[in-house]
Curated annotation (Swiss-Prot):
Taxonomic lineage of the native organism: Eukaryota, Fungi, Dikarya, Ascomycota, Saccharomycotina
Organism: Kluyveromyces lactis (strain ATCC 8585 / CBS 2359 / DSM 70799 / NBRC 1267 / NRRL Y-1140 / WM37) (Yeast)
Keyword DNA-binding: yes
Alphabetical UniProt keywords: Activator, DNA-binding, Nucleus, Transcription, Transcription regulation
This protein's encoding gene: MATA2
Organism domain of life: Eukaryota
Chain residues forming the annotated DNA-binding region: 58-132
Major localisation: nucleus
Function summary: Mating type proteins are sequence specific DNA-binding proteins that act as master switches in yeast differentiation by controlling gene expression in a cell type-specific fashion. Transcriptional activator that induces the transcription of a-specific genes.
Name of the protein described by the UniProt record: Mating-type protein A2
């Protein structure tokens, strides 16, 4: 399944205006979609020479599927980082995601397996989608390499799945799709200020309350000296944290690098 699920994407040629007569009525383009009736792969990638010779519009019809697969891969990687031994995966983290997922298939949890099965379903049914994102060669990497916060994964994934309502992907329930946990926002403690206790009066009171003594000055010097820069971690762990985690809870796309 790993081989069929995690294939690299290729480019496809869009039907030109000359072939408009052969397009079925069901696949006619609207304002937000691009018609792509011929589903056979040419097997040839576009080169600069062909683009210069022909100025007709080209598209990447699998962009819709690639976006969904990217969202799933990020969630799978986050799941692996949370629930599995970090040191065990550090040596293999810079390999393709397919190798990591195939090795963890037998020891993964049920919800992670449901992600893999849904990925396989998306791979087998990508050609059933009639609405595709237009592809611009100057911004070809922005769609697949764009960092997406985990809080945005669920709504974007559901909006993408609604496009292909006719495929077997729609048989999955919302409970199976909503596996991304909501991040609970920490409630900030607020204090009501009376007329007598304004921020300026509190600041003046604290400033008067602390007299300038030698003890306080010595303590402040000791505290300043004790604040030494943290020791840098090992090279592997540093690269690991920089590459796969950040403060914004963004997981980089490993597959389409």
């Amino acid at each position: 399944m790993a081989n069929s699920t995690l294939r690299r994407t290729t480019f496809f040629k869009l039907t030109t205006t000359e072939d408009e007569d052969t397009i079925p009525k069901l696949l006619q383009p609207n304002n937000n979609s691009v018609a792509f009736p011929n589903l056979k792969r040419t097997g040839k990638a576009f080169t600069n020479d062909t683009i210069k010779e022909n100025t007709k519009k080209y598209t990447r019809p699998r962009n819709q599927f690639v976006l969904m697969r990217t969202l799933f891969n990020r969630r799978v990687n986050n799941h692996i980082l949370q629930y599995y031994n970090k040191s065990k995966l550090e040596k293999k983290m810079f390999t393709l995601t397919s190798k990591i997922t195939s090795e963890l298939w037998n020891e993964s949890s049920p919800d992670l397996k449901s992600y893999f099965s849904l990925l396989a379903t998306l791979e087998e049914n990508w050609h059933k989608y009639t609405h595709y994102c237009s592809w611009d060669r100057n911004s070809a990497q922005t769609l697949s390499m764009e960092p997406i916060e985990l809080s945005q994964v669920r709504p974007r994934l559901i909006s993408s799945l609604t496009v292909g309502a006719g495929s077997s992907v729609s048989t999955y329930t919302l409970r199976e799709l909503l596996l991304v946990r909501k991040i609970k926002s920490r409630k900030r403690k607020t204090t009501t200020l009376t007329q007598d206790s304004s921020p300026t009066t509190k600041f003046k009171y604290k400033f008067k309350k602390q007299p300038k003594t030698k003890m306080n000055s010595n303590l402040s010097k000791l505290r300043f000296k004790s604040k030494q820069p943290p020791t840098p971690p090992e090279e592997n762990s540093n690269v690991f944290k920089k590459r796969y985690t950040s403060e914004n809870r963004i997981i980089e796309d490993l597959f389409l690098m």
